[in-house]
Structure formats: C-alpha cells, structure tokens
Amino acid sequence: MKKTDELRTIRIDPLITPSELAKKYAITSEIMDNVIITRQNIARIMTGEDLRLLVVIGPCSVHDPIAAVEYAHRLYELRKKYQDRLEIIMRTYFEKPRTVVGWKGLISDPDLNGSFRVNHGLAVARKLLLDINELGMPAATEFLDMVIGQFIADLISWGAIGARTTESQIHREMASALSCPVGFKNGTDGNIRIAIDAIRAAQARHLFFAPNKDGQMTINHTSGNPYGHIIMRGGRTPNYHAHDINSAIEHLREFNLLEHLMIDFSHGNCLKEHIRQKDVAKSVSKQISQGSKTIFGVMIESFLEEGFQTVKENQPLIYGKSITDACLNWKDSVLIIKQLADAVDTRF
C-alpha cells in the first residue's frame, strides 16, 4: 500500500497518559499546598508586595535522581535558614534544548544510552518531583516539549521558556495556559525584545491543540498568564549590569509591564565559564544592596561537584557532577546564597 506520510518515522511507541502517571505517582494535599503557596509567594515578589529575592538554583539538568535528592536535602536547609530574605527554589530541568544534537534530558533518555525509554523517564521525573516537594523544597523547570507539561506541571512552582523557544508562538501559547509564573529568556544573541513580546503574548487569551490528561486531543482555550517576566541571560555580551537592567526596565515600562526582572548568572552572563557566576553574583548583590528593587529573582547553575563531565560508554560517572553545562560546586553555592541574603537585608 502506498503512503504519503510517516515516511521518515522509524518507530512509534505507546505513551502512558498523564492521568495514568498521576494516578501511579499521586500528588498529596501537603505537596499541593506547598506548590500553591510558593506560586503565590513568587507572584508577590514579582509585584513588589514581598521584598524577598527569588533564587532558582540547581544543576543545569537532572541526570541522577539520587544526587538530585541529596542536593535538595542540602538546599532545603538553606531555604529554611534564609526564608525571611530569600524564596529558594530548586532547578529541576528534565528537558534540554540542543543547538544541534545531544542528550535531550532525563525524560527522553533516562538511561543516558540512546535507548529512549520515555515512559520510564516520565515516571522517574514525576517521582523525583514528588520526593523533592515532599521535603518542602519547591521545584522549577523549563517547559520545552508541548506535551510533557501535562505529566509534571502540577508539581512545578516556577517555569521557564528558554532562549531558543521564547520567540516560538506555540510556547507563548503554552505559557498563557501554565498555572505557575513563567520566565522568558532573552534570545541567544542578547535580544530582549523577543522576551518582552513573549510576556505580552502570554498575558493574552489563546487557543492551541494538545492532548488532555487522558490522551484525547483537545482544543485548549487559555485565560492568559499575568506573571510572565524576562530572564536576562546575556547574549554576545553579558547583560546583568545596571545599565542593561535600566534599559530593560524602560522597555517593560513602554508596554506597562511589571518593572521587575530576573538575572541568570550563567550562560551568556558568565561567558559560558561557570566560575564567573561568582562575579555576576557579586555585581548583582552590590546592585541590590545599593537599593535596586527591579531585580526580583536570580538563577544559578549549581550542583554537588564543580564543572561538568562527558558521558562515555563503560565509564562510571562522577557522582553529583553535571553532564551538560558546567556548574558551581556546593561550597560556592552556599557562599553565593549567603551573599544574596545579606544584600537583600537592605530592602528591609
């Protein structure tokens, strides 16, 4: 029989439905309360009602659930210690956008070997989010695939749309439907206008096509997300300095948007040298201590061990070390969090 479609599809595997996965790994009332309260706290920080600083910190990507849980335990102690000045949330990224090709994250390839056991990856990711939230540690993630959010979004307190997808219409539409505050990164070239356009688009009502929790394709009508914001992640040059922030605020003001933004210490702002995140932290802390109220949040790439490692066949991985972007180690992360908390003292 002749065909005119699916000519380049080599395999189609059955996928568990979001409702089936949620039934197996069910959210508890305590976790639900934690997610709701954290989202509300972030919204209040964004609007300036809460003077604390949002800190999204954690590994570039999650590849080892055991190491991620250990990191969450450590981070929760800092969350409690600095809760009067910081709203600390753990970065739990399960999807990785690639410039060309590469490992695309725990959900698509949990075994790190190209076997693509996606159903297992979804189960591992959801179970991990339950474990982390159960500690009292809220979770953040990037929403990349249009379907994966259906499996985990109920456990996410803050979401991001990455630099490569901020300009995408379908991601803006998805953001308009998400129940959590959503940050839009500026473009990889440093263009902040696309992020501002994304904020405006996500505030509006949209419709898009997506499966529901039972796997039935549906037409989603959204109300719009009022808590979109820009994440300054640098580009060809860093954009965390005071003049960059002032310029971004002027653009936000032009469209009557909330005059608050987030600074990513990594990526273009550290010139892709992870250790320079400490320099960004020093500069941002100084701006906050000198009275800047426009910086409502920061993002830091951090793990148990410093740097990154390459996955090699038949070679064990170093525990607690990133397999994607290089991260700061735990010791430096503790120092940066204290530095930020001290800077925020001036707001009170």
Curated annotation (Swiss-Prot):
Domain of life: Bacteria
GO molecular function terms listed in the Swiss-Prot or TrEMBL record: 3-deoxy-7-phosphoheptulonate synthase activity
A Gene Ontology cellular-component term: cytoplasm
Reactions the enzyme catalyzes: D-erythrose 4-phosphate + phosphoenolpyruvate + H2O = 7-phospho-2-dehydro-3-deoxy-D-arabino-heptonate + phosphate
GO annotation terms (biological process): amino acid biosynthetic process; aromatic amino acid family biosynthetic process; chorismate biosynthetic process
Transmembrane domains' residue ranges: none
UniProt-listed InterPro entries: Aldolase_TIM, DAHP1/KDSA, DAHP_synth_1
Keyword Metal-binding part of the UniProt annotation: no
Alphabetical list of SUPFAM superfamilies matching this protein: Aldolase (SSF51569)
Keywords: Amino-acid biosynthesis, Aromatic amino acid biosynthesis, Transferase
The UniProt record lists the keyword Hydrolase: no
EC annotation from Swiss-Prot or TrEMBL: 2.5.1.54
Enzyme class per UniProt: transferase
The protein's annotated pathway: Metabolic intermediate biosynthesis; chorismate biosynthesis; chorismate from D-erythrose 4-phosphate and phosphoenolpyruvate: step 1/7
Family membership noted in the UniProt record: Belongs to the class-I DAHP synthase family.
Physiological role: Stereospecific condensation of phosphoenolpyruvate (PEP) and D-erythrose-4-phosphate (E4P) giving rise to 3-deoxy-D-arabino-heptulosonate-7-phosphate (DAHP).
Name recorded for this polypeptide: Phospho-2-dehydro-3-deoxyheptonate aldolase, Trp-sensitive
Source organism of the structure: Buchnera aphidicola subsp. Schizaphis graminum (strain Sg)
Gene expressing this chain: aroH
